[in-house]
Amino acid sequence: MAENNHSSTALPATEAPHFNEAPRVLVIGDIGQHTYHVGDEAMTIASAQALSEGGAAVTLMTRDVDHSARYIGAAVNHEAAQHEAGAPYEYLPFLLFPWAPAERELTLAAFECVLTELHADREHPSTAELSVLPQVQALPEVLHPLAQTVERMVEFADAIAAMDAVVVSGGGNLNSRYGWLLYERAAAVRAAEHASVPVYVTGQSLGPVLSPEDAQVLERMLRTARSVTVREHSSLAWCRERGIDARLSVDDATDYLAASPARTLHYAEGVSAGQALDELPERYVCVTVNECTEQQAQQLARLLDNMWREHGYAPVFLSHFGDPQNPESGDIQVHQRIAAQLSASTPATLLPILHADQSITVHCGAAFTLTSRYHPAVFSAAAGIPVLALVPDAFTQMRVGGALNLYGLGEFTLPLGMLAGGVPELMVAAALRHAAVASDARRTELLEVLRTERAYLLAQILGSGKCAAPAPFPAVEQVPALPEPLGATVRAARELFTETSLTAGFEWAMSDRAHSWDAEHRRQLERARAIGGGYSAHGIHGAHGAEQTRPVTVEADSESPAEVHHPARPGLLARVARRLRS
């Protein structure tokens, strides 16, 4: 049965925007990180390129303008920008949020108040006037001096107000695990909402771990958007449970192409990938693993030794996360541990972190992919390369299992704790058998899904008349990875593993938030004592709107806050701990 899409959210023809020049579109993705992340860069670049080629003048939101200018394209000065389709990208720095849950919640509340004042029907407020708002006064010390933070907020809001559209490009960070990234996107969407700039959300994974507060932030963001696509069935179900219009699609980087395979990262002295890339084995298994125990490293080495003996696939270790200025950071640490356990007769190649353009070239040349990361599976499945995904937690299972499921390969995921007993070897053999007889029909079908979604997005942004929503997502049969009853046993173990990991993840999120608010309460109490000798009339929080930001304790399956506890009441952490233990 095909997945049901929501009804068209396209503007009626009478409301469609019309532009005398290329519309300015802000694309939000996790680019500009000094610790380079191949998948994050690839998703953003693919989205930006499609929009630019389709007629938009693209601005990329980045964590570091110089970094993105070096690895994506030359930065353009805003005043000198041509605002033409196909012109070099402009860049807008992120409004960065603190990591701690309490601090990011306070920051979003303050930014919301600044936006309200900026868009009120009166004279534009000054920095001094905005700085004395109670919500701004309550900002965490990491954002002091307040005047500088307010100026940055105003600049950020003004930049978004100047856009014709905002596209939140794909990613897996809309959850409490990466809550500061969720809030950074929420801030951009709220700025667009206040300025009546249309928002579009593409290729997202939602959750799976979300505190009730973070879930509310995400829900508002998605309801603001005119169009939402998600990249796995579980994310679609999350939207449907809340009555949010969404469509199932594929990852934004599914059709990523290397614009310049010779483009390299800026490495520390003495590090180079050139020779290793020139001397890759003729037949190899591409390995990307970001975490494993010592026992699992030994088991993975035995699996790779077996693949060399049985199939002639030499392991090529390809990092997807790492700092090019620190050759020992990121995935390569795990790769070195696994490679050290290989048999002396198994040839191995360890590559440093590569530019996304070079990474996709390595992936497409592989005979097999073994990965615990998401985008190696995406790139390989899209290229018809057999994949076995190794799953360390529910977060990875939801994403990589969801991606492979769209190709009918959802059974080819295995918890890292099940590497013993010959199961991985059986799954490798099954993946190779399927790849030998599989046609490219499903891959072509999914590429057409992405092409149609992008055409729909462009039609809405460009205002080319009323558009019908894309056709329902095509269904597919899942390919067995193991004979029965072994397949059923592995499925049951995978489900139990996922449930256990989800529970642990939710408990961590609640504990992290409780500890964060406890520290914030102590800070505010100390501040109140320092300036007034005791509590203010508004309690520990002062007048910054504590009603919206106090921590709550909830049941693990609850979707709404339970009773609000007064922050001054002692024993908050003890009560949370008792709830988690129960």
Please state what every model-predicted region is.
Residues A2-E547, T553-E555, L572-L580:
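Active-site anion-handling motifs in enzyme catalytic cores
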Residues T396, H565-A568:
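Residue-level signature of the cytosolic catalytic core of signaling kinases
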Residues R550-H566:
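Acidic, proline-/serine-/threonine-rich low-complexity intrinsically disordered repeat tracts
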